[in-house]
Amino acid sequence: MSDVSEVTTSTWDDEVIKAQGLVMIDFWAAWCGPCRIISPTVEELSKEYSGKVKVLKLNTDENSDIASRYQVMGIPTLMFFKDGTKLDQIVGVVPKQFLKDKIESFLNK
């Protein structure tokens, strides 16, 4: 069972834009092999940063308007928002430690 909630077009503003604090969104699709590779890392980070970082997943096939709005050209894309403002995005599979370092830098700003 996943600890990571799904965000959709209809919940995007409430879950991401109006959220206080750091939010990490995993843009993915069911057919995407690299998305399946990074998914366990996203789950682990959700547990490790519980209460500090809101971790969400967005299915790009079902919510293509959000993916288009933020110009997501490749998946997986991990996007970071803080207090409703986009901070950064990472495209592709990256090591867990890289993501932890990125999260820590955003939490300490």
Can you say where each PLM-predicted feature lies in the sequence?
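Non-catalytic, surface beta->alpha helical segment in thiol-disulfide oxidoreductase systems
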Residues: 82-109
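Structural micro-motif
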Residues: 64, 70-79, 94
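Conserved Rossmann-like nucleotide-binding pocket used by diverse enzymes
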Residues: 3, 8, 28, 54-56
